[in-house]
Amino acid sequence: MCRPTDSDSGPALPSIPHQYWIIHGATYDLASYIKSHPGGDEAILLGRGRDCTELFEQYHVLNNKHLRVLERFRVTLPAAKVATNNLKEDMVSTISAFEGEEADAAAVVGIQQPAAPARVAHQSDPFYEDIKAMVRAHGNTKMSAPFVILHCLHVVGLIWSMKLWWQGAFISAFILPYFLWVLCAAMVHDGGHFAHSKRPLVNKLLTHTGALFTNSVGCWYLQHNILHHSYTNLVGKDGDLDSHHPYMRIHPEQSMLPANIHHAVRFFSHLIMYNFAHIGLTMISPLSYFRGVAAQKKGTADAKQAQDAQTVAQYHSTVMLQLVTVGAFYITPFLRFDFSRALLLTLLPTFMMSVAFMVIAQVSHIQMDAEAPSADLEKLHWARRMALTSVDYSQESTLWAYLTIGLNMQSLHHIVPGVSYSQLPRLYPAYRAICEKHGIKLLERRNLAHAFWTHLQTLWVLSKTHSFVEVARKLA
């Protein structure tokens, strides 16, 4: 599923997703609260059918009212109900002994990857409490007025570049991807994190509009908001890590296949694939969703496919619309112009958007000092884990925040994704001080070039070695 985590290990799993929200180990039925949710329906629906503890914490930083509201919807489920609602028939006998007893969250989640530390009611951590206090003191968490004006100008630029592209102008192949990145990708990323505005409808409209030519909203929510932001750099859980494997090995815990290929070939093949990431976001991810739906109908879907299909199905119509717009982008030039010009108008924007995404977005996480054994990372409070699995650079530069849509400060962004990237440069000095106070060593680079260089070094080492022990020996 777009993008699925590994689901071929462990015991048999439920094939029918449940409809509950699992937070801090407790089960909640928030169905009746969806329409009343202040953050909008899309935000709350991301957590349905899964353990959404990290999501719940990440988007509720301004006060603690959410904890009181949440308790109104706590439910106690008998294990028998969990079995009939959630598990395959061949699993019912495994929990029948508990019939009549309260089902724990692990049984309800079922398909969720095993959590390392036990979930407890509201995990408080001094580091995260200081982060929340910092955000509250800052005040405005949504897009700043200068960036709103800038993006209005970008709309004009996007329309102009699309007009040139429609006319077949050579220059449009360079200008269009620029506006797709600084405007559309920014709208999808910030809007998808509900960070543009306090009004859910504004976030929704901007996200879905920007996604028409950049990615599929439903698949993006699944891979990015849920799998990546909740499980950053955890192998088998982080959708970004697993979406590249086995074609690209980007973590020491991942296997290296095929073993008979020279490491230099693996390394350069990896870089070549960077040019096609945009196709994965716009076409392959949605198609994998439809494969999951088809597998469900045939009864062959495993639990992970079923869970992910349920999440993306909430945005089925937008997935269809986005496939139509992307299809039109790739087909129209070949109907209007000669083959070479059509190839230029389609492939060059694809390459530029792909490189922008892979270099700017992935360079922060695929770094040796940002990767550690998943079992060790899972022992940390999730906020500390976010700070230790991202590399930052040019953090106090508004220009670089603009050019990278805030992805130059991913450690802070991952802790408070609901804060607009336009606010991050002003927050970063206080964030750095908080990290120093709590003994968290930030992973910093001088600039993007420096970060990209250490990223390449990481890929080179990973192309030759297998384990953390071997990697450490190489770097010693």
Swiss-Prot record:
Taxonomic classification = Eukaryota, Viridiplantae, Chlorophyta, core chlorophytes, Chlorophyceae
Tell me which Gene3D superfamilies the record gives.
Cytochrome b5-like heme/steroid binding domain
Q: What does this protein do?
A: Front-end desaturase having a omega-13 desaturase activity for omega-9 unsaturated C18/C20 fatty acids. Strong substrate preferences for linoleic acid and alpha-linolenic acid for the production of pinolenic and coniferonic acids respectively. No desaturase activity for dihomo gamma-linolenic acid and eicosatertraenoic acid.
Where, by residue number, does heme bind?
H37, H60
Motif location (Histidine box-2)?
224-229
Instruction: Give the protein's recorded name.
Output: Acyl-lipid omega-13 desaturase
Family the entry assigns: Belongs to the fatty acid desaturase type 1 family.
Q: Which UniProt keywords apply?
A: Fatty acid biosynthesis, Fatty acid metabolism, Heme, Iron, Lipid biosynthesis, Lipid metabolism, Membrane, Metal-binding, Oxidoreductase, Transmembrane, Transmembrane helix
Question: Looking at the keywords, is Iron present?
Answer: yes
Which GO biological process categories is it annotated with?
Answer: linoleic acid metabolic process; unsaturated fatty acid biosynthetic process; unsaturated fatty acid metabolic process
Which reaction equation describes what this protein catalyses?
a (9Z,12Z)-octadecadienoyl-containing glycerolipid + 2 Fe(II)-[cytochrome b5] + O2 + 2 H(+) = a (5Z,9Z,12Z)-octadecatrienoyl-containing glycerolipid + 2 Fe(III)-[cytochrome b5] + 2 H2O; (9Z,12Z,15Z)-octadecatrienoyl-containing glycerolipid + 2 Fe(II)-[cytochrome b5] + O2 + 2 H(+) = a (5Z,9Z,12Z,15Z)-octadecatetraenoyl-containing glycerolipid + 2 Fe(III)-[cytochrome b5] + 2 H2O
Q: What is its EC number?
A: 1.14.19.12
